[in-house]
Amino acid sequence: MNLGTLVSETRNPQTMDLDALPTPELVKRFNEQDTRVAEAVKATLPDVARAVDAAVAALKSGGRIIYMGAGTSGRLGVLDASECPPTFGVPHGLVVGLIAGGPGALLKAVEGAEDSQQAGEDDLVALNLQEQDLVVGLAASGRTPYVIGGLRYARQSGCTTVAVSCNPDSPIAREANIAISPVVGPEALTGSTRLKSGTAQKMVLNMISTGAMVKFGKVYQNLMVDMKATNVKLVDRACRMVVEATGIGREEAETLLKQTDFEVKPAILMALTGLDAAAAREKLAAHQGFLRAALEH
């Protein structure tokens, strides 16, 4: 493949004079380019929705969401995966981020790590990949061998696969069941895909993980009711969520949360139904953790 023909590698005619610009104009040019990202992502929403549904299906069947990528793409996957346990109360390992070159590549580039298809396969083998897992390959260029190898192995293993790339009709898209390709155009700094391409990938990942967790019962209204209250800020947020979802006073909300070890879902159910903590937990379990269903039935 001639990499110079990739949209993400071509020069942007609107930023050819970056090195001659005064600082206010320089940052204005960056911002002008960034405004195009949301529109590019918008064009992919039907495919993003399919990916969300695939992620929900994986979770409901006992599978995992596994992101894999190299460089910026890999770091974004690891970032999104690492935010899921505190935000949604899911166990570590339910959403996994793999980066070419291993954890050390998060902080320091590992030269050549992305160039091995076998490494992508090996990393999935090490995770004991199961057919109910969803594998999401991330590569701005759409041709990273590490990701191609991983997606190919995942498909051979019976997994549903998703490819997220910022070039049209990319090699990784051809390896996936679902292709998400927000084409953001040439970068302001030629080939620096940590810019618009990285932003687009982050937006897509936000929707996949958050959408999946909404559909998996981790959200009530627009509240993260399975959040782990692990610090002062989050304890305060837990109290506010109970108050906002039920209309009770803060003091009563704190009393209920102390009875539930600061778990928000049972506290809301207790406030709205009069159940005690044990009965509230039991009712939630009977409705697979979906608070709305527990309240309506």
From Swiss-Prot:
Domain of life assignment: Bacteria
Keywords, alphabetical: Carbohydrate metabolism, Lyase
Catalysis: reaction(s): N-acetyl-D-muramate 6-phosphate + H2O = N-acetyl-D-glucosamine 6-phosphate + (R)-lactate
SIS domain boundaries: 55-218
EC number(s) reported in the record: 4.2.1.126
EC class: lyase
Induction pattern: Induced by MurNAc 6-phosphate that releases the repressor MurR from the DNA. Repressed by MurR in the absence of MurNAc 6-phosphate.
InterPro entries on file: Etherase_MurQ, Glucokinase_regulatory_CS, MURQ/GCKR, SIS_dom, SIS_dom_sf
PROSITE patterns: GCKR (PS01272), SIS (PS51464)
GO molecular function: carbohydrate derivative binding; carbon-oxygen lyase activity; ether hydrolase activity
NCBIfam families from the UniProt entry: N-acetylmuramic acid 6-phosphate etherase (TIGR00274), PRK05441.1 (NF003915), PRK12570.1 (NF009222)
Miscellaneous comment as given in the Swiss-Prot or TrEMBL entry: A lyase-type mechanism (elimination/hydration) is suggested for the cleavage of the lactyl ether bond of MurNAc 6-phosphate, with the formation of an alpha,beta-unsaturated aldehyde intermediate with (E)-stereochemistry, followed by the syn addition of water to give product.
Family to which this protein belongs: Belongs to the GCKR-like family. MurNAc-6-P etherase subfamily.
Quaternary structure, from the entry: Homodimer.
Protein name listed in UniProt: N-acetylmuramic acid 6-phosphate etherase
Species name: Salmonella dublin (strain CT_02021853)
